[in-house]
């Protein structure tokens, strides 16, 4: 976990708490073993860490899912987690970046809904206008 001091004014500082995660691989099976229960335990632990440590920003740096076309159950687990932690932590912001196991377009598809929950997703690298 990274604690980053940010100077707002010369005499006023705040601390921003950033929690960086990656490689969740929701929906993964390991040699035929379904890891759904493990993923649920992890997400519950993560939600509790966010609450207890008053995290300001959660970064999910790729491989949210194990495959580019995840099951409905895996997607449901993902969206329920985002809804839960943003509802329980009104100042939390989430940034998600697609990894090589993720479908960038699939992660970005519900962007307007995710933005309503203070969540930004970047899956596709876009070229700047004029350059």
Where do the PLM segments sit?
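Metal-dependent catalytic neighborhoods of phosphoester/phosphodiester hydrolases
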Residues: 31, 64-82, 98-117, 123
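Binuclear metal-dependent hydrolase catalytic cores
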Residues: 11-16, 85-92, 102, 107-131
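Low-complexity, flexible helical/coil segments
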Residues: 53-58, 93-99, 130-131
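N-terminal active-site segment of His-dependent metallophosphoesterases
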Residues: 3-82, 90-91
